[in-house]
């Protein structure tokens, strides 16, 4: 595609902005039991940072590391896919799939990534490592255990940044749910707007960026499935009152390995329209995706939901509030839900009261360390990524 219309650009901007809003909305309630949040959640800060009121957390900080790399001039023409990478035949025997069984298609031979694409992955990995390295200065607070272990090992390693991260992630891969945290899913949404119109390239990008910290099939799958849903929501020609349905998320199953599609179809179907606190929002990537999806779909049909009020932006607000009520890892569940809600309703649907106070830390433009950015900065950044990366 050659251009985006105004509505698509608004939805592209909504991906990053609504993620940050969900993140900041969930921060104060992290660790609460499912369903324990009484009344509408508010951006009052605190949490595990602790964070200032209306400040986003590590979820959005890592997403902004990716966004900053996607905007870097070193990425030629936005061509971020690894076109020459074959499927599982060239992959190393590492990583785990469902139930802890080895998944030979997971950890790919990253040496096959073309140099023009490797430059982007290096840029993302370098920003992750810089983010991690400034923890003592107040950036990178509340880092997940798995992400911390991988980035710590990668920081001490040798070679190109992406190669160090991929290697460290593979070395720290664990079986079962413990090795499949939600630290990649929480940051994946922005990748959806990097190659709009090219689902295969976007899926490859989502897999490889996930693998920088999490070498697990469930993490790859969840990132691919969610990123694809976000991208299609940005590009779709929605009618004013049209809501997100089960088929929208299931449409991404064709991008997953055939042997894992049944697992994900069950996960989607059993969480559609369910009260999110019945799923919970703890750190396993599959549970997080299910909780976010439940919050989105349940809030559309709930008595206090958005039926008849879609054009007012209530769909986005109700969905994020429902995500926080899932409990557990509330900032991450709401951040993930925000990616897709923003892709459906757009940046223009974000309540002005949230937009006025939202802020947080992001990579310093043109250097190392961080700077503070606000809602308007995220919109500009997302629009730039979307326009730069249009697939030909």
Segments predicted by a language model, with ranges:
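Structured, active/binding-site neighborhoods that engage oxygen-rich ligands
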Residues: 1-392
């Amino acid at each position: 595609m050659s251009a985006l219309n105004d509505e698509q650009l608004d939805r592209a901007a909504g991906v990053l902005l609504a993620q940050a809003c969900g993140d900041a909305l969930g921060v104060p309630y992290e660790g609460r039991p499912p369903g324990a949040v009484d009344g509408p959640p508010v951006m009052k800060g605190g949490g595990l940072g602790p964070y200032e009121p209306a400040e986003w957390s590590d979820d959005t900080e890592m997403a902004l590391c990716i966004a900053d790399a996607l905007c870097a001039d070193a990425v030629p023409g936005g061509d971020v896919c690894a076109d020459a990478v074959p499927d599982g035949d060239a992959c190393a025997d590492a990583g785990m799939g469902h139930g802890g069984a080895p998944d030979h298609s997971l950890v790919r031979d990253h040496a096959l990534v073309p140099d023009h694409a490797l430059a982007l992955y290096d840029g993302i990995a370098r920003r992750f490592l810089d983010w991690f390295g400034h923890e003592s200065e107040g950036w990178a607070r509340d880092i997940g255990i798995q992400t911390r272990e991988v980035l710590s090992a990668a920081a001490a390693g040798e070679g190109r940044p992406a190669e160090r991260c991929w290697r460290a992630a593979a070395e720290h891969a664990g079986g079962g749910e413990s090795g499949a945290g939600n630290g990649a899913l929480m940051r994946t949404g922005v990748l959806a707007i990097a190659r709009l119109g090219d689902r295969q390239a976007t899926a490859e990008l989502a897999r490889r960026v996930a693998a920088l910290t999490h070498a697990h099939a469930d993490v790859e799958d969840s990132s691919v499935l969610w990123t694809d849903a976000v991208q299609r929501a940005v590009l779709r020609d929605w009618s004013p009152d049209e809501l997100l349905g089960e088929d929208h998320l299931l449409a991404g199953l064709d991008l997953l390995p055939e042997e894992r599609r049944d697992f994900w179809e069950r996960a989607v179907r059993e969480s559609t329209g369910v009260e999110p606190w019945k799923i919970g929002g703890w750190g396993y990537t599959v549970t997080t995706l299910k909780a976010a999806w439940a919050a989105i779909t349940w809030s559309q049909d709930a008595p206090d939901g958005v039926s008849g009020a879609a054009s007012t932006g209530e769909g986005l607000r109700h969905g994020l509030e429902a995500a926080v009520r899932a409990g557990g890892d509330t900032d991450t569940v709401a951040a993930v839900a925000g990616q897709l809600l923003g892709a459906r309703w757009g940046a223009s649907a974000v309540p002005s009261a949230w937009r006025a106070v939202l802020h947080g830390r992001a990579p310093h433009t043109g250097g190392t360390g961080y700077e503070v950015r606000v809602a308007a900065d995220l919109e500009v950044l997302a629009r730039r990524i979307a326009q730069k990366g249009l697939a030909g």
